Amino acid sequence: MEHGTLLAQPGLWTRDTSWALLYFLCYILPQTAPQVLRIGGIFETVENEPVNVEELAFKFAVTSINRNRTLMPNTTLTYDIQRINLFDSFEASRRACDQLALGVAALFGPSHSSSVSAVQSICNALEVPHIQTRWKHPSVDNKDLFYINLYPDYAAISRAILDLVLYYNWKTVTVVYEDSTGLIRLQELIKAPSRYNIKIKIRQLPSGNKDAKPLLKEMKKGKEFYVIFDCSHETAAEILKQILFMGMMTEYYHYFFTTLDLFALDLELYRYSGVNMTGFRLLNIDNPHVSSIIEKWSMERLQAPPRPETGLLDGMMTTEAALMYDAVYMVAIASHRASQLTVSSLQCHRHKPWRLGPRFMNLIKEARWDGLTGHITFNKTNGLRKDFDLDIISLKEEGTEKAAGEVSKHLYKVWKKIGIWNSNSGLNMTDSNKDKSSNITDSLANRTLIVTTILEEPYVMYRKSDKPLYGNDRFEGYCLDLLKELSNILGFIYDVKLVPDGKYGAQNDKGEWNGMVKELIDHRADLAVAPLTITYVREKVIDFSKPFMTLGISILYRKPNGTNPGVFSFLNPLSPDIWMYVLLACLGVSCVLFVIARFTPYEWYNPHPCNPDSDVVENNFTLLNSFWFGVGALMQQGSELMPKALSTRIVGGIWWFFTLIIISSYTANLAAFLTVERMESPIDSADDLAKQTKIEYGAVRDGSTMTFFKKSKISTYEKMWAFMSSRQQTALVRNSDEGIQRVLTTDYALLMESTSIEYVTQRNCNLTQIGGLIDSKGYGVGTPIGSPYRDKITIAILQLQEEGKLHMMKEKWWRGNGCPEEDNKEASALGVENIGGIFIVLAAGLVLSVFVAIGEFIYKSRKNNDIEQAFCFFYGLQCKQTHPTNSTSGTTLSTDLECGKLIREERGIRKQSSVHTV
């Protein structure tokens, strides 16, 4: 009203009033009136999607900025949107020129690399900022300065993937790419084999055809368990369906997807398969502000008309939408810092750049902001994003984290953040393997596992029942009890299946495996619970738990028939060699004693003490007397010959000590040899087997025992394997039962595990274990290599061991009736068959003594008769020559008397010479 009165009064409009009004219109009004800043967007469309998600995010960001005046209080952001067909770079260039002519402060899009290059070239020529949010292959000679790209650098993502591969210690990796740009994005990983011990196999998805089943079939056949997929999220959704169809969605596979939209896919169908699925996430959903924006976006999308099926969760914000949202905000931040930003109309054909373009471009590159995709900063030189974080997420069954908003709750429920990769500091895993195993029942509870096993008493046997049995009830044994205990601890359900070929698992000359090991390698079974030996060659292709039983290889052989001691069994306590050595020792000691007794002067004595001047001395230790002394000492009897000299006493004392030990040892062993029936076995050890060929021996075909001898470098075992391999048709048996029957019925020795031998000998008294253990090893639960169940099974086995349940189970299944009849043979009365030889020796000695006495009598009689005749004849001749007679009666008498005297004198001389020996 006041302004109306003032104007109505004439004469009050003056020159000063005019200048004031002009000042207000030129200076005050522009500063207080809201400015308008126009930005342009070029977006590609497809037939079934007229409006893509980037355009929606572009509009969503502009609307959010205009509603919230805190960022641009005096500026209103407007936009101009142009839509082009996919891959149409010419149309993209034309639409870009149209927008530049209209006057825009920055230009967003398009997405495809060829269109991006065309628009970027125009923006660089006219010095207008070009904002990019998609990965673009950088040109080597690119000198464009007027662009920024919010998408993480391809080299950085490739390094992140390589760091993750090294962290998981993957030795073989399969890279599956969708198009040729995938090989460019994964350059750091592809070059890894030259620097790290990693084998990389590269495969390409079929182009145009979405059927990847043939490719997946090859991967399954090649046992390629660690796979990196470089593809879009649409392709990833389709690939996952086919992976499930091929039966490759199991806990043995680990899939990594390079798409940053993996978290946005609907993976509810795969959560409980046990598969390992890992990816990167750029959205910073841990930030409550980010979560609230995502919720708003989701609400708007759910209210919009339904979109074509893309595999994404309904209303989920993708990474490309978040990047576009952040890109608009980065331009808004830069424009807020710029004062008096005037946008000019530019013509492509004039090549006249925007005057404020370089300054505005620098403001954008210098801008910093914590957006939906984390902290955003740019490299001022190349315009690429730097110092960004990638969340490492892993698919899980159930979550415990809490988040605001339904979308965030779902993300936390399906995905678990296990680490962060920063472009500067690298990998930082926050969820270690130890944390994952804190509760050992987490991943096994209510999961059904396929268990492969083999019939082997007492580990796995058919249950005897009058009623038909089905499923796991068909079997019983130690391994079934072990499975039941493991199931009670870990909470899993199991389905027991016998191995089709009935073998444990061995490798042929071509490197192919069979038996239970092959079942695990081919992932037809999750566990192998059987008497499966932990060996080096098996450990290279499958994993083992800690052993639940320790054992070794030994020899199973039938008990030899008992032989009663013979009549000369009293000789058995000492070997024939010892008997010979004792006899030689007795003869040697006798000779030494004879020589020393002759040599020492203290063994000579005067036989006539009353005549000290006698020159006649005697020595008791003649050769026969020395031998008699030795025999008497050996038989522990006296010989009435006592050595007098110190030297001869030393010989006698040492001989007595020798005989003491020999007789004591003989006496100690005599009772056992005479009273116990001896079991004489032709073999006592593996060396005895190797030294002979009469007794055939072998092992179970394709078992760990056979593998042990096949791989052994010890000469004895190499010789044994040469014997077995030369007779494979007869030496090697199909299973233990066949081998046991051969041991019982033929001359055959079976090499097998000591625990099995212990079980068999408890129930068959005709069999026994020969020798000790050849080696030491253990039985373990087998799992496919890389199985997540191995550590959990190991912990459960250690728990059973500490509780003593493993020992109780073995006692239950190994305890048998025994062989008590063995005890009755330990003591028995001696009969003639035991010691009859002693009587034979006695009788032989008596008979021998009689014959020796007769021989001595005859020998002495003949010797005396010869001496008397010789002397009578000799002295008769002497008498006739000395005393010739004249008369027959006188001379003859004298001669006879002289002859008799001479004969008597000669006999006296001979007798004296026989007593006094010098």
UniProtKB/Swiss-Prot annotation:
Extracellular compartment spans: 31-576, 675-834
GO BP annotations listed: central nervous system development; chemical synaptic transmission; glutamate receptor signaling pathway; modulation of chemical synaptic transmission; nervous system development; regulation of synaptic transmission, glutamatergic; synaptic transmission, glutamatergic
Residue sites binding L-glutamate per the record: P531, T533, R538, S704, T705, E753
InterPro entries attached to this UniProt entry: ANF_lig-bd_rcpt, Glu/Gly-bd, Iono_Glu_rcpt_met, Ionotropic_Glu_rcpt, Iontro_rcpt_C, Peripla_BP_I
Coiled-coil boundaries: none
Residues exposed to the Cytoplasmic side: 598-653, 856-918
Function in brief: Ionotropic glutamate receptor that functions as a cation-permeable ligand-gated ion channel, gated by L-glutamate and the glutamatergic agonist kainic acid. L-glutamate acts as an excitatory neurotransmitter at many synapses in the central nervous system. Binding of the excitatory neurotransmitter L-glutamate induces a conformation change, leading to the opening of the cation channel, and thereby converts the chemical signal to an electrical impulse. The receptor then desensitizes rapidly and enters a transient inactive state, characterized by the presence of bound agonist.
Gene Ontology terms for molecular function: glutamate-gated calcium ion channel activity; glutamate-gated receptor activity; kainate selective glutamate receptor activity; transmitter-gated monoatomic ion channel activity involved in regulation of postsynaptic membrane potential
GO CC aspect terms: intracellular membrane-bounded organelle; kainate selective glutamate receptor complex; plasma membrane; postsynaptic density membrane; presynaptic membrane
Protein name: Glutamate receptor ionotropic, kainate 1
Residues linked to a glycan: N68, N74, N276, N379, N428, N439, N446, N561, N766
Keyword Cell wall biogenesis/degradation: no
Domain of life of the organism encoding this protein: Eukaryota
Keywords assigned: Cell membrane, Disulfide bond, Glycoprotein, Ion channel, Ion transport, Ligand-gated ion channel, Membrane, Phosphoprotein, Postsynaptic cell membrane, Receptor, Signal, Synapse, Transmembrane, Transmembrane helix, Transport
